[in-house]
Amino acid sequence: MALNNFLTFQLLLLLLRVSSESPWIVAGDVSRIPINFLELAKSPEVFDSMVRIRRKIHENPELGYEEFETSKFIRSELDLIGVKYRFPVAITGIIGYIGTGEPPFVALRADMDALPIQEAVEWEHKSKNPGKMHACGHDGHVAMLLGAAKILQQHRQHLQGTVVLIFQPAEEGLSGAKMMREEGALKNVEAIFGIHLSPRTPFGKAASLAGSFMAGAGAFEAVITGKGGHAAIPQHTIDPVVAASSIVLSLQHLVSRETDPSDSKVVTVTKVNGGNAFNVIPDSITIGGTLRAFTGFTQLQERIKEIITKQAAVHRCNASVNLAPNGNQPMPPTVNNMDLYKKFKKVVRDLLGQEAFVEAVPEMGSEDFSYFAETIPGHFSLLGMQDETQGYASSHSPHYRINEDVLPYGAAIHATMAVQYLKDKASKGSVSGFHDEL
């Protein structure tokens, strides 16, 4: 009997030891959840899965609102881990749900569209779709969110509310976030978090700031119409080329002479099209470009239109101006909520170390995450993957690559932010409604 008791005791000790060494959290160990998520994300089970997902999506890039195969693949991964979801939302978008199905609700977002770029990186998983490439890290964003979903689903019994997973189409200029918002993606959601990989931020560090982070963005296109004719007798023409040249130069004054130096704005002409012969003055010239601003966006648009039309008139030409060419609606600035910024900063330091958080500076780049963040409290951040020995190219470059070693950091931050937000919110009490889908 004594021998049996001794063996039973030794067996219990062995089980306890194995349990303590396992990264997967057992019931009753809720306090360890945020601390353990980075360890879990780095485990072969999660890390290998994220790498596989990222490479699969990278090989098959699809443009905005055309992410049919990408969406199908994401849904299959959600099915594998038993996560319920709603589809379609905004044509190809997906909304997944993990947790109680009850308040509070917090959302995590990943974009999934590619860019019309021919990949120049030669490697085993190079894009198989000519002229299309994941050159902005969206394949990594999806992989990180699915990694977080895997971790959260394994610990769903500990969630004090519901995590909403938003897989968004068409971030690159087509305002997919706006369409998802219009189709109810934020129903009952009280806060939303987004992460973007950054080749300019040191590896493993997260950058953010409170307030305006990403500029509002818009586009413009103008057709300047004159009267074409032979280039040898310009006096018999009304030259739209000269008018367009004057317009391009005059637009530069909007920033250098009309903008407070402490208030960043950008107006850039990116295309000038017209004419097809050396000895013919064309009837018209088309110009177009982009504008970025944190404040005074509407006024900047009005001045662009005014300068184009009046400079054209000075040169006896007419001008028509389109401030939403190709359906590209102006995008508001991305503004980080102060309370969420404080939570994010604390989570990053607790999870990755005190030096892991970097105070960012405002970016003139734009993000349609802004449509979510102007509706409910939101927080957008950059996750660094910079490695000077590797020389990672900037976003939107045909040479763009991802440092896959950073994927666990993104998954862990996603999961920890969701758990911590729900924990804090539940402790204060939440009055939101229920999701009909759950």
From Swiss-Prot:
Binding site for Mn(2+) 1: C136, E172, H396
Main location: endoplasmic reticulum
Cofactor: Mn(2+)
Binding, Mn(2+) 2: C136, H138, H196
Cofactor note: The Mn(2+) ion enhances activity.
Enzyme Commission numbers on file: 3.5.1.-
Keyword annotations from UniProtKB, A to Z: Endoplasmic reticulum, Hydrolase, Manganese, Metal-binding, Signal
pH dependence: Optimum pH is 7.5.
Molecular function via GO: hydrolase activity; metal ion binding
GO cellular component, one term: Golgi apparatus
Keyword rRNA-binding: no
Tissue and organ distribution: Expressed in leaves, stems, roots, siliques and flowers. Detected in pollen.
Any one of the GO BP annotations: auxin metabolic process
Signal peptide annotation: 1-20
Enzyme class, broadest EC rank: hydrolase
UniProt KW rRNA-binding keyword: no
Location relative to the cell: Endoplasmic reticulum lumen
Pfam families named among the record's database cross-references: M20_dimer (PF07687), Peptidase_M20 (PF01546)
InterPro entries: Amidohydrolase, Bact_exopeptidase_dim_dom, ILR1-like_Hyd, Peptidase_M20, Peptidase_M20_dimer
Family membership: Belongs to the peptidase M20 family.
PANTHER family, sorted: IAA-AMINO ACID HYDROLASE ILR1-LIKE 1-RELATED, PEPTIDASE M20 FAMILY MEMBER
Task performed by this protein: Hydrolyzes certain amino acid conjugates of the plant growth regulator indole-3-acetic acid (IAA), including IAA-Ala, IAA-Asn and IAA-Tyr.
Name listed for the protein in its UniProt record: IAA-amino acid hydrolase ILR1-like 1
Lineage, uppermost ranks: Eukaryota, Viridiplantae, Streptophyta, Embryophyta, Tracheophyta
